[in-house]
A protein has these predicted regions:
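Nucleotide phosphate-binding/pyrophosphate-handling subdomain across enzymes
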Residues: 40-42, 133-134, 138-141, 149-162, ...
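A structural preference for short, hydrophobic beta-strand core positions in alpha/beta folds
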Residues: 72, 222-223, 297, 398-399
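N-terminal leader/targeting and accessory segments in enzymes
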Residues: 1-50, 54-69, 79, 194-202
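ATP-dependent carboxylate-amine ligase catalytic core
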Residues: 17-19, 23, 27-41, 65-156, ...
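Acidic, Mg2+-coordinating active-site environments of NTP-dependent enzymes
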Residues: 115, 135-143, 158-249, 262-284
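C-terminal helical cap/extension that packs against the catalytic core
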Residues: 200-221, 231, 270, 309-315, ...
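Active-site-proximal loop/hinge segments that shape catalytic or ion-binding/gating pockets
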Residues: 425
């Protein structure tokens, strides 16, 4: 049997574009496969600009702590392709084994009969095929891009549809206004299904989501609208809805935004029919959750050995303007607890708003090193990122690699060991985890 990598190489030749948002091709393929999308466990469908993966990670951790099996489909992967598909099992799921993935992809290739289809579409079909054949209690399904015409939007009646915070990203596909992006995300709302709307950073996004949820005949459940609320109190997470109030531990994932994501996850599970999950399982989920590359502290590994003694090394895949704002706020919160100089190591794609992203760190970062992202044709040259950073008011210089940037820190005199944040791209995150020898599991 061909490996999944060999199959992917062939799939790339089946469509001239990596992204082509429509449902016709995947609906045709799913019909030929016997409609696996109709044979799934209850589905919680998740869209949004920021926080989708973290919200799913919280849900999975809580479900597994409750003794339930949760299938998970997310994208993109960080290092290895099979990270996108997690097969649920009681006691904890695992990434789909290579032989199972290759078999499912081969079956999809055969059913597709050489017709045009994108890699994401055929991967989604393979994931749904696997999930339909392996029993589980729930499927946590992340939208790839947008929602309305995303390949995952083939579930007629999800147990719940969730939209996490919306911002401006992927304007070439979703539109260049928050309202346009919200309209695409709201396309996952379905008649008579709960529509969980997380706290939004933009009032216009919240208004569009609520209006379109009602227009779809969904049952909107909004944070802060007497449906549910979540806030930090004395370093703990307080969640309240129309039936319960939970005083919970601080989420293990770092950053104030993770309180919002955790609360959204709890609301989604309760709306989707998992309201009998007890406080102990919720607490265990918040304490044990993992989501690599999102404010992840690297305490061991090859790269962590390159930093000055006593330094902190952090990694985050934030890459859009709002992601940068969230990330800067998290770094500022850490800075309030200890006045440690912040060093940024940044790699960005050319499709992202580099100026908007970097401006969030003005007055916060002591120095920035711009680095290339290997094997990414769309990556901005490091020299260009450094120039943009300097133009917005950051002290910046280019480095040939993350390793070179880390090694050069020994030439800078800091009053105390610095806090180092590598950020700007999930592709960069994958490269860093690989170089550090700490792959996602």
């Amino acid at each position: 049997m061909d490996s999944s990598d060999a199959l992917m190489a062939r799939f790339l030749a089946l469509h001239p574009r990596t992204i082509d948002l429509s449902l016709g091709r995947i609906e045709r393929l799913l019909a030929r496969l016997g409609h696996p999308e109709r044979k799934l466990p209850p589905v919680i469908h998740v869209a949004g600009t920021n926080g989708k993966g973290s919200t799913i990670a919280f849900m999975r951790a809580i479900l597994e702590a409750a003794g339930l099996a949760a299938h998970v489909y997310t994208s993109p992967h960080l290092v290895r392709f099979h990270e996108r598909i997690r097969i649920g099992a009681i006691g904890g799921g695992q990434f789909v084994p290579e032989d199972q993935l290759a078999d499912a992809l081969a079956r999809c290739e055969s059913a597709n009969e050489g017709e045009p289809i994108t890699v994401f579409e055929i991967t989604t079909a393979a994931a749904l095929l696997l999930f339909s054949e392996i029993p589980a209690d729930v499927l946590l399904l992340e939208v790839g891009l947008g929602g309305r015409v995303d390949a995952t939007n083939v579930i007629d009646r999800p147990a719940a549809a969730v939209v996490t915070p919306i911002g401006r990203d992927h304007a070439e596909y979703l539109g260049d206004t928050v309202e346009a992006v919200a309209t695409e995300k709201a396309g996952i709302f379905k008649k008579d299904c709960p529509a969980i709307i997380a706290a939004q950073d933009y009032a216009e996004a919240d208004a569009v989501l609520c209006r379109l949820a009602e227009a779809a005949g969904a049952n909107p459940i909004r944070v802060g609208n007497q449906d549910f609320s979540v806030h930090a109190e004395r370093g703990r997470l307080v969640y309240q809805d129309d039936t319960d109030l939970f005083d919970l531990p601080k989420p293990r994932l770092n950053g104030r935004h993770q309180f919002t994501n955790a609360g959204t996850a709890i609301a989604a599970l309760r709306a989707a029919g998992f309201g009998d999950i007890g406080t102990a399982a919720i607490e265990a989920g918040l304490n044990n959750v993992e989501w690599p590359g999102r404010l992840q502290r690297l305490n061991r590994g090859r790269l962590s050995e390159l930093v000055p003694q006593g330094s902190e090394l952090w990694l985050d895949g934030g890459h859009n303007v709002d992601g940068g704002r969230i990330l800067a706020a998290a770094m500022a919160d850490l800075g309030e607890r200890s006045d440690v100089p912040l060093v940024l190591i940044v790699g960005l794609l050319g499709t992202k708003d580099a100026e908007g992203f970097l401006r969030n760190f003005v007055g916060l970062a002591r120095v920035l090193f711009a680095v290339p992202i290997a094997n990414q044709m769309a990556a901005r040259p490091a020299e260009e990122v450094a120039q943009i950073a300097a133009e917005v008011g950051l002290v910046a210089q280019a480095a040939s690699s993350v390793e070179a940037a880390l090694e050069s820190l020994s030439d800078i005199v800091f009053e105390q060991p610095p806090r180092i944040l590598i950020c700007g791209s999930l592709y960069l995150v994958g490269a860093v985890l690989t170089a550090n020898g700490t792959l996602p599991v």
